UniProtKB/Swiss-Prot annotation:
Has the structural arrangement of an alpha-helix connected to antiparallel beta-sheets by disulfide bonds (CS-alpha/beta). Beta toxins bind voltage-independently at site-4 of sodium channels (Nav) and shift the voltage of activation toward more negative potentials thereby affecting sodium channel activation and promoting spontaneous and repetitive firing. In mice, causes intense writhing. This is Bestoxin. It comes from Parabuthus transvaalicus. It comes from the Eukaryota. It is found in: Secreted.
């Protein structure tokens, strides 16, 4: 089953890029900014588990 989630967007409407795939401290911080406890780097963008609202840019 697919885990729900999404790519959060910054204030300019862009995804957060990342270089270190998988577990990524920067992405963890980004996801916590968006109110989600866990995230990782997938396809060079931060992806947040169970993050559904892609309109809540920070």
């Amino acid at each position: 089953a697919d885990v729900p989630g999404n790519y959060p967007l910054d204030k300019d409407g862009n995804t957060y890029t990342c270089l270190e795939l998988g577990e990524n401290k920067d992405c963890q911080k980004v996801c916590k900014l968006h109110g989600v406890q866990y995230g990782y780097c997938y396809a060079f963008s931060c992806w947040c588990k169970e993050y559904l609202d892609d309109k809540d840019s920070v």
